[in-house]
Amino acid sequence: MHITSEPAILYFGTPVVLVSTVNENGTYNLAPMSSAWWLAWRCVLGFGAHSKTPQNMIRTGECVLNLPSADMTGAVNRLALTTGSNPVPASKIARGYRYDPEKFATAGLTARRSEAVAPPRVMECPVQLEATVESVHPLAEQDEKWHGRLLAIEVRIRRVHLSEAILAEDDSNRIDPDKWRPLIMSFQHFYGLTPNRLSDSRLARIPESLYRAS
């Protein structure tokens, strides 16, 4: 039996992505997100328009998409309620965010030089995708509650770096899905490719109702 429902969020489960970008002063920003999907060598990323990451991407035209494995929940959690925006936007203050100019250090992760773009890769992530911005699309423009608040950014993957540990034995251009265990975000909780929750996410402390447009 089904019932009509109106959840505040529709995060049914997608891979966590750590997006690295370059700030105005040349330092690095690193932000976790999970509103992402791929088709061919393109990826579409969903952001709040006033977040630091999309602002950096639009300004520089570059980013790196770093995909953590399921054993990296600790590092991702340490980033979960941080922002590179100073001052912190009111909407993020309401959710418990704080300004952090040293995201790599906070997460305990290592910045590694990229080959095709300026933002660094995350050395610990098994998948590292250097990318450039192709187009920016506002979302929900017809909804006065969301007008100007959401963006979909299409990026083109320029360089793919993969850990040898997740590659197929007979083909270095193919990932073995039996070896790759992505970290999944589902309704603000961390999961892997197993039925059980891996650990609690700090984002789960935020009431889902705070994500409704007001």
Annotated model-derived regions:
Residues 1-214:
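Basic, polyanion-binding surface patches
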